[in-house]
């Protein structure tokens, strides 16, 4: 129970290690991080009893940037035949669970195990329920079984309210055929990640206005239009005719980094390929000057020192807003649909309600 296991995007194991090591050092939890390149996972092995539990207790999962999912526990080797009996024996000292997720890594090997997990879950669930180890209670801890192979599994536990929203941190979003580009899924995932579902009507309402900077061909604009917003699309490139035909989109041929609205809007979204420091300046202007209430912006990552650069820019934003004496909530996550980038959500907390 003294290892913290984390899923991530393949190639970002080093960023997960850097991030969790920084938090562990700040909290005084001794241990070391390790992650095999392209394995889609990393671990923090605690050298003191209860270290992993303390890390998960002190940290909020939604404040971590690069981990997609986490659980504390340990590895179990399984026989070829009676895997369930071995797992039940291993779970004797665990609490009673309120939910069960079988997970695999986001790798070719992991995908090959998906069919096995689907078939294995039904008899395992029945056995856990019969043994009194699993009940239907969202308030209880979640049992997370990450299969590395058919013979090796990481048996982990996490709070259902302090872990990923979806198994492996991967949302099951369907690409809308009428959307102009697949980038639309990034913004849809961001809504789920950063805004509680019960607040969507209030914060993503059809009486709102939005701006999409660098909008062409309209993947992110599509999400705003889908919510019924009036959208100003800023880009020198063309917009999809299907979006223009809705009557909800005004397309202005302008530079997304210099154009500003005459009146404040509810939402600004931006997915421009640019150096992250320049995009950060754009965020500071829009939120700092009250040009929008909320924003979702992608920061493109450098080739090296990716976590360090993201941390530096987030700290810079926080210091800038503090110096201006304005209250802004800042969240950042590498979403499943992100590639060499992270997605930031910002919200002014000191503006009068609409």
Swiss-Prot record:
<keyword id="KW-0949">S-adenosyl-L-methionine</keyword>
<keyword id="KW-0808">Transferase</keyword>
<dbReference type="Pfam" id="PF18125">
    <property type="entry name" value="RlmM_FDX"/>
</dbReference>
<feature type="binding site">
    <location>
        <position position="235"/>
    </location>
    <ligand>
        <name>S-adenosyl-L-methionine</name>
    </ligand>
</feature>
<dbReference type="InterPro" id="IPR040739">
    <property type="entry name" value="RlmM_FDX"/>
</dbReference>
<keyword id="KW-0963">Cytoplasm</keyword>
<dbReference type="Pfam" id="PF21239">
    <property type="entry name" value="RLMM_N"/>
</dbReference>
<keyword id="KW-0489">Methyltransferase</keyword>
<dbReference type="GO" id="GO:0008757">
    <property type="term" value="F:S-adenosylmethionine-dependent methyltransferase activity"/>
</dbReference>
<dbReference type="GO" id="GO:0006364">
    <property type="term" value="P:rRNA processing"/>
</dbReference>
<dbReference type="InterPro" id="IPR029063">
    <property type="entry name" value="SAM-dependent_MTases_sf"/>
</dbReference>
<dbReference type="InterPro" id="IPR048646">
    <property type="entry name" value="RlmM_THUMP-like"/>
</dbReference>
<keyword id="KW-0698">rRNA processing</keyword>
<feature type="binding site">
    <location>
        <position position="183"/>
    </location>
    <ligand>
        <name>S-adenosyl-L-methionine</name>
    </ligand>
</feature>
<comment type="subunit">
    <text>Monomer.</text>
</comment>
<dbReference type="Pfam" id="PF01728">
    <property type="entry name" value="FtsJ"/>
</dbReference>
<feature type="binding site">
    <location>
        <position position="255"/>
    </location>
    <ligand>
        <name>S-adenosyl-L-methionine</name>
    </ligand>
</feature>
<dbReference type="InterPro" id="IPR002877">
    <property type="entry name" value="RNA_MeTrfase_FtsJ_dom"/>
</dbReference>
<dbReference type="InterPro" id="IPR011224">
    <property type="entry name" value="rRNA_MeTrfase_M"/>
</dbReference>
<feature type="binding site">
    <location>
        <begin position="216"/>
        <end position="219"/>
    </location>
    <ligand>
        <name>S-adenosyl-L-methionine</name>
    </ligand>
</feature>
<protein>
    <recommendedName>
        <fullName>Ribosomal RNA large subunit methyltransferase M</fullName>
        <ecNumber>2.1.1.186</ecNumber>
    </recommendedName>
</protein>
<comment type="function">
    <text>Catalyzes the 2'-O-methylation at nucleotide C2498 in 23S rRNA.</text>
</comment>
<feature type="active site" description="Proton acceptor">
    <location>
        <position position="300"/>
    </location>
</feature>
<comment type="similarity">
    <text>Belongs to the class I-like SAM-binding methyltransferase superfamily. RNA methyltransferase RlmE family. RlmM subfamily.</text>
</comment>
<dbReference type="GO" id="GO:0005737">
    <property type="term" value="C:cytoplasm"/>
</dbReference>
<dbReference type="GO" id="GO:0032259">
    <property type="term" value="P:methylation"/>
</dbReference>
<feature type="binding site">
    <location>
        <position position="271"/>
    </location>
    <ligand>
        <name>S-adenosyl-L-methionine</name>
    </ligand>
</feature>
